[in-house]
Amino acid sequence: MDQPEDTDALVRFENITYSYPYSDSRVLSDVNLKLEKGEFVLLAGPSGCGKSTLVRCFNRLVPEISGGKLSGRVIIRGKDLREEKVHKLALEVGMVFQNPETQLFSLKVEDDLAFGPENLGLPGKEILSRVEKSLKAIKLEKLKDHFIFTLSGGEKQRTAIGGNLAMEPEILVLDEPTSDLDPSGTREVLDLLRRLNAEKRITLILIEHKLDEVFELADRMLVMDEGKVILDGKPFDILCREEGKLKKLGIHPPQIIEISRLLGFNCRTSSPPYENILKRLAELLMPSTRELQPESRKEAKPKIPPALCPEESLSHVRIEKLSCRREDGSETLKNVNLDIKYGEFLALLGHNGAGKTTLAGHLMRFHKPSSGRILLNGKNISKYSTAQLSQQIGYLFQNPDSQIFMNSVFEEVRFGLKNLKIPEEEMKKRVNSALEMMELSVYRNRHPQALSRGQRQRLAVASILALEPDLLVLDEPTTGQDRGHIHKFLDKIRELNRLGKTVILISHDMELVAEYAERVIVMKQGEVLLDGPAAEVFLSPEELDAAGLIPPLPARLALDLRKQGFDVPGMLTVSELKSFLRAHNVEIRD
Ligand SMILES: Nc1ncnc2c1ncn2[C@@H]1O[C@H](COP(=O)(O)OP(=O)(O)OP(=O)(O)O)[C@@H](O)[C@H]1O
Ligand SMILES: Nc1ncnc2c1ncn2[C@@H]1O[C@H](COP(=O)(O)OP(=O)(O)OP(=O)(O)O)[C@@H](O)[C@H]1O
């Protein structure tokens, strides 16, 4: 980095074109970009469009580590990165990867946060101060001397963010940093990013599928498709003006934009504040007001598909007085009692570290309870091995890489079926249909590690669907996916549920839970805090708040309207809000 070039831009991408090794197809195609110092850039696009590949050019992980062929130049502060070394750039350009496990390599949380500053050669006092500040920012002070391998998914993600914050880089690239965080953790991290950007003028490049949370924070939005930047502008403008194009790419507008448009707001630069939306709704409902006709109320109720299983009332899973004490003495499950019927679609929610994965893991006997028992189809599972249980339970791990180990996409899906000793023809049929369902047929011969994160997640799901188990346990299956793929996948899961399969979905995505789950269980610090129909649970704001959860926007509006005396049902989705308004002859813009 000797001869600075004459330019104001902090980062310039000039005609960047890239192909991975052994592949002729261009993953990045003639990308030209300029980023100014202090910009907060949101990068969006469908799964597999090249977002992660693009951001890895910022510190030359592409092509130095990935291999492959890169043409064009990346210039940071006037200096051509082709003359730079990856390890040096890593100190200037912070990067929070999609999978936190790939960047946590110390034994304990605080050691991991100190690693970067130590490499910068900072004095001991400064290192300590930075570690303290980062711990506070990521709210992990209490876990500072915990071993990394004992952390929950979200706690690991916070640690990975903290490690980067401690380096105080000029440019920080974050590849879906909130994908495993609970809603209040997501808000905290995004708020922290906003502060870093505003106060320290750190340039931020954020890949994020949760647009509701970020579109008002970022100055600029880039949308990619098939290796190209196809839209570049103010997030609000793009989301409002390019809705058709975005929807085709599987990018859905945030609920607040959808609802404000329905209600006739004519916004130019930002969405109206929540209070204005509530006020407009109250005004619109006033004429038909507070006494609802029984018929219309019936129509507005959430449409929950009845499970078709004839044995509906029988317990598929019964969890009795289950407690789990870890080796370090901490109690991660406390007297959990649950009765899950055949054909239920339930969601398991809770703050990071609440015990969701630990509870789900007990179903597979990954952990042994310290007391209590679990009955599956009426039988105590303590008699079964994990291998036997996996023939009845399709279990999707939080991190897809924990369950992918074959050399090709096809073989990966086939692997589980081989263990079931199914005839070859039937096996092929099931593999092909699972790959097609997850839109992975074109990658059938590819090595799974040469897929994007979202594609690997879909591969893990395909492997489980091919087994056709009666009980599906899905631990955050939608991480890293665009809305289009998420809906296709969850529609399929709902179809299976209607055929009688029982579904347990662990998720931090309240909008999806509101749309798909019939029953919602909220956990807090190892205990069940709430358990009931989705509409009821989402209308319990105090308890949800205590568990770090934020109800979806339509549910919040319904609740506040009730407080004002309106007789409204527990609406959970934008389409329920629409039908409710129509039933009251309220004119809406669709
Ligand atoms: N090592 C590799 N070899 C060949 N192709 C690869 C490799 N890694 C990724 N790809 C392909 O490059 C394309 C872009 O991948 P990338 O990870 O950049 O996508 P993405 O937009 O970040 O996706 P996601 O949102 O799912 O993380 C994908 O089609 C993927 O299959
Ligand atoms: N091996 C272990 N030893 C000690 N504590 C552990 C161990 N594994 C997990 N824990 C702790 O148990 C608690 C529950 O973890 P779990 O993974 O079940 O949470 P979770 O609700 O699934 O969280 P997330 O939403 O972050 O994935 C966490 O605080 C975690 O730190």
From Swiss-Prot:
CDD domains: ABC_cobalt_CbiO_domain1. It is found in: Cell membrane. ATP 2 binds at G350, H351, N352, G353, A354, G355, K356, T357. GO terms for cellular component: ATP-binding cassette (ABC) transporter complex. Residues 11-251, 317-550 form the ABC transporter domain. One of its GO terms (molecular function) is ATPase-coupled transmembrane transporter activity. PROSITE patterns: ABC_TRANSPORTER_2 (PS50893). It is an enzyme of class 7 (translocase). Belongs to the ABC transporter superfamily. Probably part of an ABC transporter complex. Responsible for energy coupling to the transport system. This is Putative ABC transporter ATP-binding protein MM_3016. It comes from Methanosarcina mazei (strain ATCC BAA-159 / DSM 3647 / Goe1 / Go1 / JCM 11833 / OCM 88) (Methanosarcina frisia). The lineage of its organism: Archaea, Methanobacteriati, Methanobacteriota, Stenosarchaea group, Methanomicrobia.
